[in-house]
């Protein structure tokens, strides 16, 4: 038979456990989005922002700034969408070097990065996979600056070269805060660098969802990829994997250790 003192202790412990369990069950699913700011990514971002925040809470966004868009216009576009949706509380980080000044001057290598196999543990340099997008399309997509300028309400947040939070800092901060799911809808560079550098934080990653690759392709013409260059040169490559295949390899390999 338990003594009154021990009984009180047991009841107290059970009460604390029940309180913590209720807190966990009632907590929203925390989400971090890693994007290359392609046009379809805007729709994905808007969808996440429309979800009930008490159930699904987007807490951070990181940009994988490659040849598809550049860091300055991409970050500003994201900022304006967040402002329009009333979510200026969301931190935005960018992987890549360079910048755009307030007067529109484009600094060298804006938003580019070396594929992970060439860059070591940094995110600086030029992208060697520009063959995946013809030059004309790059310039057309960079004109998303004009889209945001004419169609989106603009808040006060702006991309500032050398002061913008890095993608790695945002990922580390958000994963360190507690359990989180990571959505990757661009190249895998940012996530691969994080997973390789911060194995001690893997226990906080609940799920990783990626948009990339092709499985059991049944195209009768043999074209299973989606590159913008001539399909016959690489009929199987998928854009998000192709832009940094070694990073994708690292993500898939390290997933087994989560």
From Swiss-Prot:
The keyword Glycoprotein applies. This is Nucleoside hydrolase 5. It is found in: Secreted, Extracellular space, Apoplast. One of its GO terms (cellular component) is apoplast. SUPFAM superfamilies: Nucleoside hydrolase. Pfam families: IU_nuc_hydro. May be involved in the degradation of extracellular nucleosides. Its EC number is 3.2.2.-. Residues 1-22 form the signal peptide. Gene3D superfamilies: Ribonucleoside hydrolase-like (3.90.245.10). Belongs to the IUNH family. GO terms for molecular function: hydrolase activity, hydrolyzing N-glycosyl compounds. InterPro entries: Inosine/uridine_hydrolase_dom, Ribo_hydro-like. The gene is NSH5. Glycans are attached at residue 52. Its main location: secreted. Keywords: Apoplast, Glycoprotein, Hydrolase, Secreted, Signal.
């Amino acid at each position: 038979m338990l003594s009154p003192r021990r009984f009180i202790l047991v009841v107290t412990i059970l009460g604390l456990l029940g309180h913590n369990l209720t807190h966990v069950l009632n907590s929203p699913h925390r989400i971090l989005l890693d994007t290359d700011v392609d046009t379809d990514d805007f729709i994905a971002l808007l969808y996440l922002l429309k979800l009930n925040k008490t159930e699904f809470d987007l807490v951070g966004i990181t940009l994988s700034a490659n040849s598809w868009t550049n860091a300055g216009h991409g970050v500003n576009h994201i900022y304006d969408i967040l402002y329009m949706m009333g979510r200026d509380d969301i931190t935005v980080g960018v992987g890549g070097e360079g910048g755009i000044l307030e007067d529109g001057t484009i600094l060298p290598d804006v938003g580019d990065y070396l594929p992970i196999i060439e860059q070591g543990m940094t995110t600086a340099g030029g992208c060697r996979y520009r063959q995946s997008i013809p030059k004309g399309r790059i310039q057309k997509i960079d004109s998303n600056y004009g889209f945001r300028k004419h169609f989106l309400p603009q808040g006060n947040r702006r991309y500032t070269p050398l002061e913008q939070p890095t993608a790695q800092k945002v990922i580390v901060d958000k994963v360190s805060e507690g359990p989180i799911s990571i959505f990757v809808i661009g190249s895998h560079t940012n996530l691969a660098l994080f997973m390789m550098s911060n194995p001690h934080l893997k226990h906080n990653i609940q799920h990783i969802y990626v948009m990339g690759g092709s499985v059991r392709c049944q195209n009768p013409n043999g074209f299973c990829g989606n590159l913008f260059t001539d399909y016959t040169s690489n009929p199987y490559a998928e854009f998000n994997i192709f832009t940094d295949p070694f990073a994708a390899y690292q993500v898939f390999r390290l997933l087994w250790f989560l």
